[in-house]
Amino acid sequence: MSDIRDIQPQSCFYHSRGLRLHYLDWGNIGAPVLILLHGGLEHARVWDQLARQLCSDWHVVVPDLRGHGDSEWSGGGAYSIVDMVPDLAALLAELGDPVIHLVGHSLGGNVAIHYTALFPQRVARLCVIEGLGFSPEARARRDRRSRLEQLRQWVEKAREVDLRRPRGYASIAEAVARLREHDPLLSPELASQVCEHGMRINERGLWQWKYDPRVRASGPSEVASPEPSDLWRAITCPVLLMYGARSWASDPEQDGRMVHFTSARRVLIEDAGHNLHHHRPEEFLTHLQAFLHGSD
């Protein structure tokens, strides 16, 4: 009997708005298409463990968002959510514009929400893992500063990121230790995989993350932006919102954001943080599969 870990994806490329972007195709062409979108500062290979368990039922496709993983960097630092939505549209055109099932984490979840709101007829079901953006409280706290002040701070941060030398590590093991220090709920095996696939040797001979450091400076379009409740209301398909009980993210069932969705359900995963699909993969997968198959 073959080991599920022997299943490997095909590495593919496509183009969007002048950038050469990368995605993983896990095969099973002809099955319903399932798109998995990673979070900020991550890459497509963080989904490997889950993709291997999903690809028997689905045609699983996992892109590297622009500026992440093996996708090209944007020369102008165009990394806002609205910059990434056309990239997803271009990927789906590459696949023949199928109706899809869509899963996104954090930044990827926000991209998924935007796409689904703009093209509701193209998404059958949407799962968002802590990807609604600012909570009402965080947005109010941000907006105590004027729009001019927010723009000024964005310019200063963008300059700071441009001038800062990315951190380098002497070894993958050192990077793994640092990652687990930042996220102690991450298993050693997954932390190693995240680092092995997400790092490269730089000109100083040190290991450095593949992502463009400029993705840390969110786009000016998000400065003083209003709550995107119009997007949430435009989504017509069933939505599963997943949150970790130990996460810093605000629970949309408690803060009122869920009322803007036509058909949404919230699931809270115990003993999990912001990366709940990594912290409790089996429990996450149970909820996700039931939702995708419409048996939740």
Predicted regions, residues:
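Alpha/beta-hydrolase
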Residues: 166-245
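Alpha/beta-hydrolase fold catalytic core
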Residues: 1-34, 55-58, 96-99, 133, ...
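Conserved HGGG/HGGXW glycine-rich cap/lid loop of the alpha/beta-hydrolase fold
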Residues: 24-73, 77, 257
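Catalytic histidine-centered segment of alpha/beta-hydrolase-like enzymes
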Residues: 272-285
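Flexible "cap/lid" loop of the alpha/beta hydrolase fold
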Residues: 117, 124-168
